[in-house]
């Protein structure tokens, strides 16, 4: 009775408990023992106690109630009347893992515990202090924020029967020294993928833990490096080491007789494959993608191999005969992105089980091996793109009934597209890519038989005839891409039936007739591109119903009528190009009402090029945005308008989400039409607009003040209209403006004297009634001045002879005067340069201890006119450079970048130089190129790589630079094996200061100020004294002013450095350079590359540091630095704070580079550094910077929250 009182009488819910027990007895089968009732009751109490410990959330585990059978609880399963399984995946528990160990692990009959993506935090150590049910054999804690060393896994030693443990996608670190003694494991499954595990000691730890029974082991997506000892897991069937930093020979196995799955992709493995795998008879999956294997493909175990991926290595030679042995078993074969050559052998046709073959991006040649390919009766995906195959495409491909994807793009295929390619009514073809070939003739009507077709790309061929109306029957078609052919006739009305259509791209054809209004029935359309045709009629107002439409390109046609106001209803529109048509009427204000209603990222992942026009009379519009999947960039010469229109720059990339919140259009080109009336003031609300071209119309009235609201505009063209009045002062607030053209209007008054107007050339304001800089006509100072000018004019008219005499005397006076002025100018220049050197270093506001840095609006530093530099460039002949590089031989090649290849060369005078061979920039005329060279050559600073000379022959443009002995910071920092240099902290600090000094010079001491646009560690070179020299700073100038727009596309090859605002506005700024510099500084502090899937997974270096800012921030520092000298930790934190300030997501909050230099000076003032790595008297002088910077040295650079604010 006493026991009963304990259970019932002393509890306020005793009646509920009694009812619960009776309920269980009633429903239990007769054979169930009474103990099961008590056991299930205990399980229920344990679960309810766990719920009670959770944060109070009304929607969390709502049916976990004392009056409910626990076997019906959300996520709970029972066996033999006991809780046996708990699955709370994707439940936002938001608790420490210790609660799990206290309440859930002890459940005595629990077999499986799944808490994937449950927002768990804390460490694993609490498990060691808890009980664990003897039946528990599987724990899944993936996708949480559990931290601590992986050696904490030893805490699960209390779970004696644990067989499977999934800790993937957490924040676990390398194994620590402390491990639970006496812990024994019989784990069969261990998943540690996507954590923060780095270093070289993982495998010794695995051996020490006695994981000898492992069958599944994954450490994918970590930061492991070093060599791998001989692997001794006799039961291992699944091993995934992909996406790490291994740079070593292919691992060897003591016993791989049970190995079935091996993934080593995305590392730097090299060496012999065949001998290591020779005894792996059960191997069915082998992925060696993106490694450094070279030479011939070795013989591989052929008994069971089904999936073989060798993509992205340097395998060479003809198609490997060794693969013929695999034909009985292989299902998927990927040999893409290697250097295979020759013809595809007939033996491939014997691979009867093959479902996927990808041999793209190699050098295979010869006639398309049709007979061989037709033997692949089970093939579903066939990718042969980017090779050199010739010949035609036969009807017989229809004999492959399972074929879903056929990609033959970018070859040299000829003939016609066969009419019988889908003659089998049961065909499954979904993707047909034949772009960038030499096909001629019509598009066959019979393509309508490809009823499953989703994507059709026949662009970049020589197809003729009309677009078949029968294509309208392809109900699943999403992509219809036919641009750059010779298609004629009208756009078929039947396309209205393509209800799934997302992309209709028909540019550069000879299409005529109207734009079908019925296209509005294709409600999923994202991209309509019909430019450079002969279309006529009006723009259908019904297109305004396309709420998903993001890009509408109708330029270079014969379209007439008004711009439909209904286009303002296209709430996702970001790109509107209507240039060079016959549009009339006014610009409708409702066109801009969509501002603030942008949909999210409809075009993410589309490959494109943007080609900037050169602005010549023959070249209309701002440029062309083109879909570019499956096309070789060197084939752009085939674009018909390229010949009369020399493009200044080609940008390529993959479309990114344009906005992460509400925004507006980024491109609007209405130029070369017959538009009338005034500019609607509503246009000023288009905050994210980057390019606005209204030139060559008949617009009139005053330029509205509201255009000052276009805060992100980089290109503004209002030329050749009838605008009157003055240039509105509001335009001076457009700080990102890189190009403006107000010429050929009726504007009057003074050109604004402030930036950015003081950087534009005079012809951008010509043929108006404007005055002031940069025009030669000064503005009159008042009535008196006007009267004087009138009198002078009268006197000149009265005495021609006197005027001539005065002119001669004046000319003589000018000659003598210029000699005197030249002498005085040279003296002043020397004084100015000396003053500049002093100015560029001495100013810094002193700060009190413990104060925080504050950035205020600062005046620009005094600037140097580029003409102040005297030393002329050395002109070299092409023969000189050809001889110096041994004909630009690969042996002389020392690097490659976004602007061209770099060669080491020794000139005849013995001097060693670096020669950059530019990519073709055929849009750059000789005069413009020479002018840019002369300008860039005058930019001299000890932290910039100086341009010594140049050479131009035909289309070739060669630049000669001072040679930097130690190459790039990227190589020295991240590839020590290549350079043999180890950078200690004083050396890294010196590099950080030098790079900042060079960038500050470009931003603040040149007119016009120079934006680097591609600041990164590979553009920081190191001379013989390991002094940092910023390189490639002039390339953006050389490639034209258009680089202030869409430069993010050029930077797509170096992700990790691009500031977030570039993805929104596609333009560059000095604050963007500051962000990129902040990434370089992080590289110096952490020793890590800006992007590395092995280090960061889907994140990058900035995001990784941000995550650590929430915890122990010192973990981000390069451990080698602290091993050498632990006392530098405070100094590293101070420099990290500088980096975080540079990396502020809000570009206006970032410091200028002058302010960055001031921070470094303050750090040095408080740390007593040696003079070899400090800012001295000959560096940047900051005392004239208004507002100043304050920084606390002694005290308190707080970890965590304060740093995260800057990120």
UniProtKB/Swiss-Prot annotation:
- For the motif Cys pair 2, give the residue ranges: 771-779
**List of residues binding ATP:** 894-902, 916
Q: Membrane-spanning residues where?
A: 803-823
Q: Which residues are glycosylated?
A: 119, 166, 196, 235, 245, 287, 339, 363, 412, 449, 521, 556, 584, 646, 662, 724, 746, 767
Which ranges does the UniProt record give for the LRR repeats? 109-131, 135-157, 161-181, 186-207, 213-234, 235-257, 258-280, 282-304, 305-325, 329-350, 353-375, 378-401, 402-423, 428-450, 452-474, 476-499, 500-523, 524-547, 548-570, 572-594, 664-686, 688-711, 712-735, 736-758
Localization annotation? Cell membrane
The annotated topology with respect to the bilayer is: Single-pass type I membrane protein
Q: Which Gene3D superfamilies match?
A: 3.30.1490.310, Phosphorylase Kinase, domain 1 (3.30.200.20), Ribonuclease Inhibitor (3.80.10.10), Transferase(Phosphotransferase) domain 1 (1.10.510.10)
* Entry protein name: Systemin receptor SR160
Organism encoding this protein: Solanum peruvianum (Peruvian tomato)
């Amino acid at each position: 009775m006493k026991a009963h009182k304990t259970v019932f009488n002393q509890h306020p819910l005793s009646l509920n408990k009694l009812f619960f027990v009776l309920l269980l007895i009633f429903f239990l089968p007769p054979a169930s023992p009474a103990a099961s009732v008590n056991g299930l009751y205990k399980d229920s109490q344990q679960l309810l106690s766990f719920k009670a410990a959770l944060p109070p959330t009304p929607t969390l585990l709502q049916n976990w109630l004392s009056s409910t059978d626990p076997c019906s609880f959300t996520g709970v399963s029972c066996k033999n009347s006991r809780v046996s399984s708990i699955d709370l995946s994707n439940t936002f528990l938001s608790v420490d893992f210790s609660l799990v160990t206290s309440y859930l692990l002890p459940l005595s009959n629990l077999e499986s515990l799944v808490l994937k993506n449950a927002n768990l935090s804390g460490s694993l150590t609490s498990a060691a202090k808890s009980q664990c049910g003897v039946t528990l054999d599987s724990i899944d804690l993936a996708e949480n924020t559990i931290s601590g060393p992986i050696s904490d896994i030893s805490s699960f030693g209390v779970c004696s029967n644990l067989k499977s443990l999934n800790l993937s996608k957490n924040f676990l670190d390398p194994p620590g020294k402390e491990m639970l003694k006496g812990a024994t494991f019989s784990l069969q499954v261990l998943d540690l993928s996507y954590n923060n595990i780095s270093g070289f000691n993982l495998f010794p730890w695995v051996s020490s833990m006695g994981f000898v029974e492992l069958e599944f082991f994954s450490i994918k997506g970590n930061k492991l490096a070093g060599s791998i000892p001989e692997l001794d897991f006799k039961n291992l069937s699944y091993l995934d080491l992909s996406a790490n930093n291994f740079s070593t020979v292919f691992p060897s196995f003591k016993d791989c007789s049970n190995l079935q799955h091996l993934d080593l992709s995305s590392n730097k493995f090299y060496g012999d494959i065949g001998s290591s795998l020779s005894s792996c008879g059960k191997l069915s999956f082998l992925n060696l993608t993106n490694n450094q294997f070279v030479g011939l493909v070795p013989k591989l175990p052929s008994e069971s191999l089904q999936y073989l991926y060798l993509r992205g290595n340097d395998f060479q030679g003809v198609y490997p005969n060794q693969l013929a042995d695999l034909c009985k078993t292989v299902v998927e074969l990927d040999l893409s992105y290697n250097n295979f050559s020759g013809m595809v052998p007939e033996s491939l046709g014997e691979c009867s089980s093959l479902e996927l073959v990808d041999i793209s991006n190699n050098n295979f040649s010869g006639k398309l091996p049709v007979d061989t390919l037709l033997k692949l009766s089970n093939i579903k995906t066939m990718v042969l793109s980017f090779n050199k195959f010739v010949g035609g495409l036969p009807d017989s491909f229809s004999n492959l009934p399972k074929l879903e994807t056929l990609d033959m793009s970018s070859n040299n295929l000829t003939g016609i597209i066969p009419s019988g390619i889908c003659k089998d009514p049961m065909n499954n073809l979904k993707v047909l890519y034949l772009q960038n070939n030499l096909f001629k003739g019509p598009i066959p009507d019979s393509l309508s038989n490809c009823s499953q077709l989703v994507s059709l790309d026949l662009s970049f061929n020589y197809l003729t005839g009309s677009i078949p109306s029968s294509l309208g029957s392809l109900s699943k078609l999403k992509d219809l891409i036919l641009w750059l052919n010779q298609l004629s006739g009208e756009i078929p009305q039947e396309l209205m039936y393509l209800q799934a259509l997302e992309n209709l791209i028909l540019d550069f054809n000879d299409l005529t007739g109207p734009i079908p209004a019925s296209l509005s029935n294709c409600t999923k359309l994202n991209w309509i591109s019909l430019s450079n045709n002969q279309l006529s009629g009006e723009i259908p107002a019904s297109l305004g119903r396309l709420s998903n439409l993001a890009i509408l390109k109708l330029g270079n046609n014969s379209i007439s009528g008004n711009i439909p106001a209904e286009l303002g209803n296209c709430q996702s529109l970001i790109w509107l190009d209507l240039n060079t048509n016959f549009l009339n009427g006014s610009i409708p204000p409702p066109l801009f009402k969509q501002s603030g209603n942008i949909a999210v990222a409809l075009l993410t992942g589309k490959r494109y090029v943007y080609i900037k026009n050169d602005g010549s009379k023959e070249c209309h519009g701002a440029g062309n945005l083109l879909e570019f999947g499956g096309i070789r960039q060197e084939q752009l010469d085939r674009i018909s308008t390229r010949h009369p229109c020399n493009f200044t720059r080609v940008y390529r990339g993959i479309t990114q989400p344009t906005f992460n919140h509400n925004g507006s259009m980024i491109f609007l080109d209405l130029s070369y039409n017959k538009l009338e009336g005034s500019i609607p003031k509503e246009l000023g609300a288009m905050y994210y607009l980057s390019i606005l071209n209204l030139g060559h119309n008949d617009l009139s009235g005053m330029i509205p003040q509201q255009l000052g609201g276009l805060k992100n505009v980089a290109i503004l063209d209002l030329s050749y209209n009838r605008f009157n009045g003055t240039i509105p002062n509001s335009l001076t607030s457009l700080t990102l403006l890189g190009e403006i053209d107000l010429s050929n209007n009726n504007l009057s008054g003074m050109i604004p004297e402030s930036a950015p107007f003081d950087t534009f050339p005079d012809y951008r304001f010509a043929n108006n009634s404007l005055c002031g800089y940069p025009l030669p006509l000064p503005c009159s100072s008042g009535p008196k001045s006007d009267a004087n000018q009138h009198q002078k004019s009268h006197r000149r008219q009265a005495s021609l002879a006197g005027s001539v005499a005065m002119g001669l005397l004046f000319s003589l006076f000018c000659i003598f005067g210029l000699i005197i002025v030249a002498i005085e100018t040279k003296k002043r220049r020397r004084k100015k340069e000396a003053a500049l050197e002093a100015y560029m270093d001495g100013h810094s506001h002193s700060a009190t201890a413990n104060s925080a840095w504050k950035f205020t609006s600062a005046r620009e530093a005094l600037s140097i006119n580029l003409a102040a530099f005297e030393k002329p460039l050395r002109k070299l002949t092409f023969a000189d450079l050809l001889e110096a590089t041994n004909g630009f031989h690969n042996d002389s090649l020392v690097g490659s970048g976004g602007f061209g290849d770099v060669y080491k060369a020794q000139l005849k005078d013995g001097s060693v130089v670096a020669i950059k061979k530019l990519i073709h920039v055929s849009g750059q005329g000789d005069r413009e190129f020479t002018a840019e060279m002369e300008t860039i050559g005058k930019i001299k600073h000890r932290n910039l790589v100086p341009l010594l000379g140049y050479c131009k022959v035909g289309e070739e443009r060669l630049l000669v630079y001072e040679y930097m002995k130690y190459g790039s910071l990227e190589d020295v920092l991240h590839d020590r094996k290549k350079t043999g240099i180890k950078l200690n902290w004083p050396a890294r600090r010196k590099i950080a200061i030098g790079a900042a000094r060079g960038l500050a010079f470009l931003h603040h001491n040149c007119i016009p100020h120079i934006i680097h646009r591609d600041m990164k560690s590979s553009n920081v070179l190191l001379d013989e004294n390991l002094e940092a020299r910023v390189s490639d700073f002039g390339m953006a100038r050389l490639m034209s002013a258009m680089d202030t727009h869409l430069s993010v596309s050029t930077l797509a090859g170096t992700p990790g450095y691009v500031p977030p605002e570039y993805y929104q506005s596609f333009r560059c700024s000095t604050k963007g350079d500051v962000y990129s510099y902040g990434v370089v500084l992080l590289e110096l502090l952490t020793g890590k590359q800006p992007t590395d899937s092995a280090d960061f997974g889907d994140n990058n270096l900035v995001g990784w540091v941000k995550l650590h800012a929430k915890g122990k921030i010192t973990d981000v520092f390069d451990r080698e630095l602290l091993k050498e000298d632990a006392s530098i930790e405070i100094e590293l934190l101070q420099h990290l704070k500088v980096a975080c300030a540079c990396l502020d997501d809000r570009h206006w909050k970032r410091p200028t580079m002058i302010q960055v230099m001031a921070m470094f000076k303050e750090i040095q003032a408080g740390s007593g550094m040696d003079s070899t790595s400090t800012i001295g008297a000959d560096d940047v002088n900051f005392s004239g910077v208004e507002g100043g910077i304050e920084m606390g040295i002694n005290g308190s650079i707080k970890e965590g929250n304060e740093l995260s604010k800057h990120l």
